[in-house]
Curated annotation (Swiss-Prot):
Organism: Arabidopsis thaliana (Mouse-ear cress)
Main localization of the protein described in the UniProt heading: mitochondrion
Signal peptide: none
Catalytically driven reaction(s): a quinone + succinate = fumarate + a quinol
Active site per the UniProt annotation: R327
Assembly, per entry: Component of complex II composed of eight subunits in plants: four classical SDH subunits SDH1, SDH2, SDH3 and SDH4 (a flavoprotein (FP), an iron-sulfur protein (IP), and a cytochrome b composed of a large and a small subunit.), as well as four subunits unknown in mitochondria from bacteria and heterotrophic eukaryotes.
Tissue expression per record: Expressed at a low level.
Function as written in the Swiss-Prot or TrEMBL entry: Flavoprotein (FP) subunit of succinate dehydrogenase (SDH) that is involved in complex II of the mitochondrial electron transport chain and is responsible for transferring electrons from succinate to ubiquinone (coenzyme Q).
GO terms for biological process, alphabetical: mitochondrial electron transport, succinate to ubiquinone; tricarboxylic acid cycle
Protein name per UniProt: Succinate dehydrogenase [ubiquinone] flavoprotein subunit 2, mitochondrial
């Protein structure tokens, strides 16, 4: 069927031998495989206790935890770990440390439930917020260089949607940070720890698909080594997906170009659902024309949004929280200002973020990164003039449905929480759901470390290091190779870039900050046609080695899967909740729509099911927060 090299992994030495064998293969198989000839692809087999896909914050934290528990762990990543998108996170990580004032994780939980517009699962939110202080102290012990107060404590800044005493005690200072480069500091710290614990990295390996057996158990993944064109089957007792979001489905996004929803699409192709994809966060302050992120921490340090008339307009929309209202509230308010003619610039299509009233030492010490970013991408000296900003796609609240252990779940019969054996997910790829319909700023870095760690702990509960694995089925990975071969030999008339641009325009125009039945129905029709056009894609490079044309085309298919499910899920949800704002259904409808959307991918068609929100907490340490009007 195909040439196969088996690489045992009972020792570190055998894996390095396998890497040597793999590095030599291109000498003997330099000609690319013929179209349709699966036997000409060379497969290298690996066996591990656990495999992590993705080396951002969630993937690295999972890998560290697995290694700490003694598991032989592989981490597959399509780019070098410290180039993962976690590096772009700026503002910080939330935890009720109480360094700036009295704080309580229950207050943090309340803010997160409220921020989620009551679509978040309260058991998972309780777990995350309760674990937050421990997670941050652990990062400090790992060596993360947090900013400090004068007395040496971790400095914490104000962030949107954060309060004291369940919303009645004023603004909370809960966001621990390393200036405005917290993600950079976090990622490098975790990578150092992963190296210390001897995690085996497979860098520049593009994960193609999950390896699922006939009883629905995940047994690993199959991946393409971009360096030499070989295919690799990673057989593992546990597979953890930490592949990030799919922001690049939109035309303007703060996401890196590598954020293509690969793990989501792998899950969808395996016949499993994706949850709540209609909830896409628009960050209020992307630089106009560039989309680069200006952290919410800029407003946390005292930055002010103004319209073309110089008015602090957020005072009208959120009289209490003002510029630090929840992100969906601020983004909608900004969009309304522009619609009503109070935008700035020749086209009146952006607003201003003022920082020039802040002391220069604050900008230098607390916001050095965005000061530099504004100078490069907007030509602005933040000490003298405002930054032109516009809401920009930033985060996907939806993703692969999981419980608070990180185990992937699906709808099976009458069980809405059926666990998929052997498969876990963490980070932006996952939907635990701790963010619900809207994520609070600085809860994302918390999410990745808490649930990356949770995945590792759960593996340790259900699996033993060195445990014998059930053999792979004979055809394991065959469909993935057929998929790869089909795309590599695509000979249509449309370049990948044109189809991608069409998709991005449809998503930007039809699934934006405000939505209507008309725009969403049109969006469903257009995105379906865009998917159909993918059948006419042309891949000009047939090689297997460093073939960026091939990789981008596979990433495009992954994006299209996410985009189609997003659009159809949004069209179906007849209410406004969090980031899903309908102009024709302006109210939240708890009676009919307090439920999670499950989108299934069926050969180009989207099928929707639903599962209930978890309203019960884990224990009696905190009571359930019942739904109420969401006001800031």
């Amino acid at each position: 069927m195909w040439r196969c090299l088996r690489v045992a992994s009972s020792s570190r030495r055998s894996e390095s031998n396998g890497a040597f064998i793999t590095s030599q293969l291109s000498r003997f198989f330099s000609a690319p495989p013929s179209a349709g000839d699966k036997s000409s692809y060379t497969i290298v087999d690996h066996t591990y206790d656990a495999v992590v896909v993705g080396a951002g914050g969630a993937g690295l934290r999972a890998a560290i935890g697995l290694s700490e528990h003694g598991f032989n762990t592989a981490c597959i990543t399509k780019l070098f770990p410290t180039r993962s998108h976690t590096v772009a996170a700026q503002g910080g990580i939330n935890a009720a440390l109480g360094n700036m004032s009295v704080d309580d994780w229950r207050w943090h939980m309340y803010d997160t439930v409220k921020g989620s517009d009551w679509l978040g699962d309260q058991d998972a939110i309780q777990y995350m917020c309760r674990e937050a202080p421990k997670a941050v102290i652990e990062l400090e012990n790992y060596g993360l260089p947090f900013s400090r107060t004068e007395d040496g404590k971790i400095y914490q800044r104000a962030f949107g949607g954060q309060s004291l005493e369940f919303g009645i005690g004023g603004q909370a200072y809960r966001c621990a940070c390393a200036a405005d480069r917290t993600g950079h500091a976090l990622l490098h710290t975790l990578y150092g720890q992963a190296m210390k614990h001897n995690t085996q990295f497979f860098v520049e390996y593009f994960a193609l698909d999950l390896i699922m057996n006939s009883d629905g158990t995940c047994q690993g993944v199959i991946a393409l080594n971009m360096e030499d064109g070989t295919l690799h089957r990673f057989h593992a007792g546990s597979t953890i997906l930490a592949t990030g979001g799919y922001g690049r489905a939109y035309f303007s996004a703060t996401s890196a170009h590598t954020c293509t929803g690969d793990g989501n699409a792998m899950v969808a192709r395996a016949g499993l659902p994706l949850q709540d994809l209609e909830f896409v966060q628009f960050h209020p302050t992307g630089i106009y024309g560039a989309g680069c992120l200006i952290t919410e921490g800029a407003r946390g340090e005292g930055g002010i949004l103004r319209n073309s008339e110089g008015e602090k307009f957020m005072d009208r929309y959120a009289p209490t929280a003002r510029d630090l209202a929840s992100r969906d509230v601020v983004s909608r308010s900004m969009t309304m200002e522009i619609r009503q003619g109070r935008g700035a610039g020749p086209m009146k299509d952006y607003l201003y973020l003022y920082l020039n009233h802040l002391p220069p030492e604050v900008l230098k010490e607390r916001l050095p990164g965005i000061s530099e970013t504004a100078a490069i991408f907007a030509g602005v000296d933040v000490t003298r003039e405002p930054i032109p900003v516009l809401p920009t796609v930033h985060y996907n609240m939806g993703g692969i449905p999981t419980n608070y252990h990180g185990e992937v779940i699906t709808l099976r019969g009458d069980d809405p929480d059926a666990v998929v054996p052997g498969l876990m997910a963490a980070g932006e790829a996952a939907c635990a759901s701790v963010h619900g319909a809207n994520r609070l700023g600085a809860n994302s870095l918390l999410d990745i470390v808490v649930f990356g760690r949770a995945c590792a702990n759960r593996v340790a509960e259900i699996q033993k290091p060195g445990e014998k694995l059930k053999p792979l089925e004979k055809d394991a990975g065959e469909k993935s190779i057929e998929w790869l071969d089909r795309i590599r030999n695509s000979n249509g008339s449309l370049p990948t870039s044109k189809i991608r641009l069409n998709m991005q325009r449809v998503m930007q125009n039809n699934a934006a900050v405000f939505r209507t039945q008309e725009t969403l129905e049109e969006g469903c029709d257009l995105i379906d046609k865009t998917w159909d056009s993918f059948g006419d894609v042309k891949v000009t490079d047939r090689s297997m080695i460093w073939n960026s044309d091939l990789i981008e085309t596979m990433e495009l298919e992954n994006l299209l899967v996410n985009a189609c499910i997003t659009m159809h899920s949004a069209e179906a949800r007849k209410e406004s909740r969090g980031a899903h704002a309908r102009e024709d259904f302006t109210k939240r409808d708890d009676a009919n729509w307090m439920k999670h959307t499950l989108g299934y991918w069926e050969e180009g068609n989207v099928k929707l099911e639903y599962r209930p929100v978890h309203m019960k907490t884990l224990d009696d340490e905190v009571d359930t927060f019942p739904p109420k009007p969401r006001v800031y």
